Amino acid sequence: LIMRIAKFISNAGYCSRREAEKLINKKKVYINKKLCVAPNINVMENDKITINGNIIKLNKKIRLWKMYKPTNVICTNNDPKKRKTIFEFLPKNMPRAISIGRLDFMSEGLILLTNNGDFARKLELPSSNIIRIYRVYIATVVKSNDIKKINYGVIINGILYKKIEVTIEKMNQKKTSLKFKLREGK
């Protein structure tokens, strides 16, 4: 099995490909005890890859975990603003995990984690055709006309957003509960 070093690191569950490229550019990655000088170098499964002295191995078995993400928590490994991350809630003895997609900082709900970067990417792509369900609570009354517009697609600031399925779950004089079914995160 031959693949680029950045992909190898991502598939091993160490970090994303972009983060792997940054580590390579910072001269933190070694292949068979030789400094890796570019993220496009091909490696084989039996090559010895180290990052900061730690041996990186491919995960043969894809693992999948589910987690409840509370509000005011971010879906990243390192936050420059020092906010809490979902990874701080994981058990200390848990293998390295990658979030599959993200939820906004103020959002709460189910988030999936895996140990395999390729698997995460496949599930994140709109072409995977996986339906994501979001419940949104709005502190106002929503008109059924507005829902129809969203269901048929809308243009916001000159950008056409594809149609999505939105339904009103509950509504009273002060607030509305909406259910969104999306095939992509935008």
What annotation goes with each model-predicted range?
Residues 2-186:
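Basic, flexible Lys/Arg- and Gly-enriched helix-loop patches that mediate nucleic-acid binding at interfaces
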